[in-house]
Amino acid sequence: MRVAPEFYELLRNRINISDVVRQKVALTRKSGNYVGLCPFHQEKTPSFTVSDSKRFFYCFGCKAAGDVIKFTSNISGLSYNESAIKLATDYGIEIPKLTAKQKEFYEESDEILNILELANKFFRTQLTPEILNYLHERGITEETVKEFSIGFAPKNNKFEKFFHDKNIDIIKLGKAGLIGKRENGEIYNLFSNRITIPIRNIYNKIVGFGGRVLGEGLPKYLNSPETTVFQKSETLYGEHKAISSSYKKNHSILVEGYFDVIALHQAGFSEAVASLGTSVTENHLHKLWRAGDEIILCLDGDNAGIKASIRTINLALPLINSEKKISFIRLPNGLDPDDAVNKNGADFFAKLIDKRISLSEMIWHIEYSGKSFKTAEEKANLEKNLKDYCSKISDSNLKASYYRFFKEQIWQNLVTKQKKATTKNSNLAPIISSHGYSELEMLEHAFCALLVKFPIILEEKDIRDFILNLNFNNKSLEEFRNWYLNEIIDNNVEASEITAIVEKTSFFDIFLLLSKTDNLFLDISFNKNNIRLDLLWQWLHKKYYLINLQQEYSITINSTDNHDFEKVLLYKKEILKIANELQVLNESFINHTIT
């Protein structure tokens, strides 16, 4: 009984794969998934994983992988189609009958798939030593040539004769996307004089071909036209091999070309796929996200690659959230993924993966790097572009995080640099305390001391968000802040256990400094016997605001000969107001007055 492919998707959505697997395998819950002993090979330690969210199983031992239908097929020995029917019967799901039009459609699809399989067998027989030598020069081994069924379409009439002998006419070859028609009406083999690379769908069926011209002809690369079985917006080259690897690694690598995919697979990066001569689509992204939470784009670093990155960013922004992510590998100038792995090796490419940047970082790189922001108009345009990106994000929490990230980047790369330049030009030296830190760095120490001595203060969301998003001048303190929040505070580590944990890290010296009974940063007493956290926080927050206000005041005074006196007066008024408020707090709380 023939069923539509849409019915397979219905089964995947309606039936939890863990329910089916549990009938054959004892499963244990682990990190949101399930693990158990693989039913397809002998093992003593569980390496078989099942994910309901990804609707997928994978064995790290024997590499068995697939969906709920594939699992049933592997267990029962039935075909994929027969397994789908069995599952529908077992779970009481109605099997929709095909209409006459659907039957005609699937009969035509089957015929096209058969023709494409025959074409690939023919192309494989046409490989010559010259072609193999060309492939070897590109770093492709004979084993890889076989694995990817790479072939060759000759110029002569062997192709036409091959199908004529099998009683397959021109009309059928046209429906399969194998022939073209010249302006003079002449019919020809579409892939004539090209290396052929079969394109397979998720079910490992050949649905089309890619062709690379032998020599310098144009176009260099050619894809099959869209047919009944081949839609470029749905298909990714290499997906039949990559999906199981993407599930295992929880990410996929999206590149531009066939040979990029082939080179990466040969080097061990079997999670690589490529879009087929077209822009990345929503369907592509959703297909990859079903297999792994992160899609790593690795596009050429030229102008075309940057434009492709921008298109993909704009497409992805409404779709991403804290779980479904996009990141980018930035290739060295002049390299594509094929070159990167063949010329520099797998270890080099693995390091590029490790150094990948987030989508937000890529946006900042595109909008900021190599550009001038000397004028108000240039800065305003930067802010507008960044806000436009943020506005496309549907996830409200992520949108807020992006706004904060870009605000921090603007502060670090524009405001802070301008402040430093102004300070240098006006001979204004930073205020240094007896501890050897600037006033701002002492405040940073004080904020970190709060984490260590009074973590209860973080129960106030505004305070936690402020400390979490604070951009430290002292990067060692910033690293300590991030580590302490993630590893100690968020894990609710008992106070008696903290020292033993920190002692094993590189942060121990900082921790000891911050843990002193009477911390002397800014001459503030952190002694718990007389502490008032509300007043302490007010003092620190106002002091931080005052220092930044004074720096902005200095910029205004020194940035031009013609001062904006109204603005200067406003700064003076605000500085005096905050200084007076701090004085009141000093008298109420601080042991040693600061002036």
Curated annotation (Swiss-Prot):
Domain Toprim: start-end pairs: 250-332
Enzyme type, top EC level: transferase
Keywords assigned by UniProt, alphabetized: DNA replication, DNA-binding, DNA-directed RNA polymerase, Magnesium, Metal-binding, Nucleotidyltransferase, Primosome, Transcription, Transferase, Zinc, Zinc-finger
Binding site for Mg(2+) 1: E256, D300
EC number of this enzyme: 2.7.7.101
Gene Ontology molecular function terms on file: DNA binding; DNA-directed RNA polymerase activity; zinc ion binding
Protein origin, superkingdom: Bacteria
Catalytically driven reaction(s): ssDNA + n NTP = ssDNA/pppN(pN)n-1 hybrid + (n-1) diphosphate
PROSITE patterns (UniProt xref): TOPRIM (PS50880)
Zn finger spans (CHC2-type): 38-62
Record's keyword annotation contains Transit peptide: no
GO CC annotation terms, alphabetical: cytoplasm; DNA-directed RNA polymerase complex; primosome complex
SMART domains found in the cross-reference section: TOPRIM (SM00493), ZnF_CHCC (SM00400)
Quaternary state and interactors: Monomer. Interacts with DnaB.
Family that this chain belongs to: Belongs to the DnaG primase family.
Functional description taken from the UniProt entry: RNA polymerase that catalyzes the synthesis of short RNA molecules used as primers for DNA polymerase during DNA replication.
PANTHER family xrefs: DNA PRIMASE
UniProt free text on domains: Contains an N-terminal zinc-binding domain, a central core domain that contains the primase activity, and a C-terminal DnaB-binding domain.
Protein name: DNA primase
Source organism per UniProt: Rickettsia felis (strain ATCC VR-1525 / URRWXCal2) (Rickettsia azadi)
